[in-house]
Amino acid sequence: MLNAPVTAIARRDSSVIVRAKDRSFEGPAAIVTVPLGVLKSGAITFDPPLPDGHTRGVNALGFGVLSKSYFRFSRRTWDVENAIYQFLGTDPGAWSQWFTLPSAAGPIVLAFNAGDRGRSLESSSPKDVMAGALPIARQLFGDDISPVEVATSTWTIDPYARGAYSFHAPGSGLDDRRQLQEPISDRLYLAGEAVGVNNPATVTGAVLSGRYAAGQLMHRLSG
C-alpha cells in the first residue's frame, strides 16, 4: 500500500499489526526500515514500547545532517573527474568539500555541508544556495564558470527522514547498533543504516542491514 504513512505498530502473541491511515495490516512479523530520525521523533507508536535496549540505542545514537548540493555549470572548467577539493575559508566548515562528477554526468560538481549549516541550506532557496556557494566555486574552478542550476537535498525537512546519517554521539557506540539489530520477540526486526555494525552510516550498510533482517525473519518463518 502506497501513500499511507505508518502511525502505529502493535506486537501481539502471534502477530504484528501495522496501522496506516484508516487501515490495518496484520502478519506474523514485520521489518521496520524507517530512518533513525523517524524513530527518534516518535512518529510511529509501538505497542508495547520498544524494549529498553532498543530504546536506549534509538535515543543514544546521534542522527546528523550532511546536505548535498549539486551544481550544474554551462561547461566543465576542470580537467580531473572524480576529484576531491578541500576548501579552507574564513568561515570554518562552510563549503569545505567539493567533488567533480564523472564526465558522463555532465558539468556537475557536488558540495557537502554538515551540521547547522547543512540544516540551514536545506531550508534555503536555490537562489540563496547559489549566491553563497558561487564565490567559492569560482576560487576552485575558475572565474569563468557559469552556473545553470543547483539542487540541494532536503533530508532534514523531510518528515520521513528527519536527517541524513547516524553517528556515535557521546555515550553511544557499536553496542547500540548491535542491540538495534536484535529481533524483538521474534516478531519485529529493525533495519537501516543505523542498525548493525557492518558499514554503518552508509547506503551499503542500510542494504546489508536489510538483508540481515530478512534472513533472520526467513529463518524464523522456516523454523
Please provide the spans of the model-predicted regions.
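Conserved flavin/dinucleotide-binding core of flavoenzymes
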Residues: 15-17, 25-26, 65, 80-223
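Short, well-ordered beta-to-alpha junction loops that form the rim of enzyme active sites
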Residues: 3-5, 21-22, 114
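Short, structured coil/loop segments at alpha-helix boundaries
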Residues: 3, 47-52, 174, 185
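Catalytic metal-binding/acid-base residues of hydrolase active sites
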Residues: 5-6, 37, 195
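Central helical "cap/lid" subdomain
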Residues: 10-11, 20-81, 143
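A conserved short coil-to-beta-strand element within the FAD-binding core of flavoproteins
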Residues: 2-16
